[in-house]
């Protein structure tokens, strides 16, 4: 069960939706999450009231104002190869669905344990189910 936050500059509702679909489809393709397991927060930033700051050339990647930050929180257990495949697939689909160049797709993954999730009712469902 990943929880995804997407922050994008100059992103209207259509672009945010396309980016959300790209990330979700990549999660399904690359690491096998169920298609109905979608929990996302999508935020567009206009550069005036809501801003994103970034280094335009950090590590030799040349970013511009089409930058998208994707933060994925998920349970631990994926291999380095699965994560690399996920990064590649997100970049591919962000370009295909939203026209965002791969150089502008910045992804982070944070992992946690089953006890760290409550899907409602004040219960840690994964922990109680032994998942």
Which residues does each PLM region occupy?
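Interaction-mediating elements
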Residues: 1-131
């Amino acid at each position: 069960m990943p929880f995804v936050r997407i922050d994008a500059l100059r992103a209207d509702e259509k672009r945010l939706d396309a980016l959300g679909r790209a990330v979700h489809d990549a999660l399904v393709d690359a690491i096998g999450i169920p298609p109905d397991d979608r929990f996302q927060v999508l935020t567009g930033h206009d550069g005036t009231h809501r801003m994103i700051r970034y280094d335009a050339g950090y590590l030799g990647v040349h970013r511009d104002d089409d930058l998208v930050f994707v933060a994925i929180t998920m349970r631990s257990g994926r291999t380095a190869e699965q994560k690399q495949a996920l990064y590649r697939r997100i970049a591919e689909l962000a370009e295909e669905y939203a026209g965002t160049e791969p150089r502008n797709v910045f992804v982070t993954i944070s992992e946690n344990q089953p006890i760290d999730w409550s899907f409602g009712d004040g219960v840690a469902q994964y922990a109680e189910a032994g998942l």
